Amino acid sequence: MQVILLDKVANLGSLGDQVNVKAGYARNFLVPQGKAVPATKKNIEFFEARRAELEAKLAEVLAAANARAEKINALETVTIASKAGDEGKLFGSIGTRDIADAVTAAGVEVAKSEVRLPNGVLRTTGEHEVSFQVHSEVFAKVIVNVVAE
């Protein structure tokens, strides 16, 4: 199924690209989320007429994401207290929700879906580097200091 992308989609393309995707992916994900429209003649003409407006909107979203990333980077360190054993091993773990709540409490609004933990949840005390994917192109990093209660 041919679609026109209205937003940058990972591993697919960017604004204005005409790509061929499976019908289910287009029908169930891209179109309902507003990331694409079917590539009909009417939609192609409509898109070309609104291209500048859509590019400006995309640039505005990117600028807002960069501003949020700067705020997150400015935090540098966030401390989370959790129960731990003698050897620094936590009872339980610290996941994306706990990190998002701690960063939000520090003053920057972050959704748990933006937290990236490449090595899985945090299970030990100490400092861990956590990255945030604020936008498909914008990343931020914070050091999470896990201390024992």
UniProtKB/Swiss-Prot annotation:
Any one GO CC term of the record: cytosolic large ribosomal subunit
InterPro entries: Ribosomal_bL9, Ribosomal_bL9/RNase_H1_N, Ribosomal_bL9_bac/chp, Ribosomal_bL9_C, Ribosomal_bL9_C_sf, Ribosomal_bL9_N, Ribosomal_bL9_N_sf
Coiled-coil features, chain-numbered ranges: none
Residues recorded with modification N6-succinyllysine: K71, K83, K112
Pfam families: Ribosomal_L9_C, Ribosomal_L9_N
Family matches, as SUPFAM superfamilies: L9 N-domain-like, Ribosomal protein L9 C-domain
A single GO BP: cytoplasmic translation
Superkingdom: Bacteria
Keywords noted in UniProt: Acetylation, Ribonucleoprotein, Ribosomal protein, RNA-binding, rRNA-binding
Modified residues (N6-acetyllysine): K89
Keyword Signal applies: no
One Gene Ontology MF term: large ribosomal subunit rRNA binding
Stated role: One of the primary rRNA binding proteins, it binds very close to the 3' end of the 23S rRNA.
Subunit comment: Part of the 50S ribosomal subunit. In stalled/collided disomes (pairs of ribosomes where the leading ribosome is stalled and a second ribosome has collided with it) bL9 in the collided ribosome contacts bS6 and uL2, while it contacts only helices of the 16S rRNA in the stalled ribosome; the inter-ribosome bridge thus formed is different from that formed between normally translating ribosomes.
Protein family according to the UniProt entry: Belongs to the bacterial ribosomal protein bL9 family.
Protein's UniProt name: Large ribosomal subunit protein bL9
Protein species of origin: Escherichia coli (strain K12)
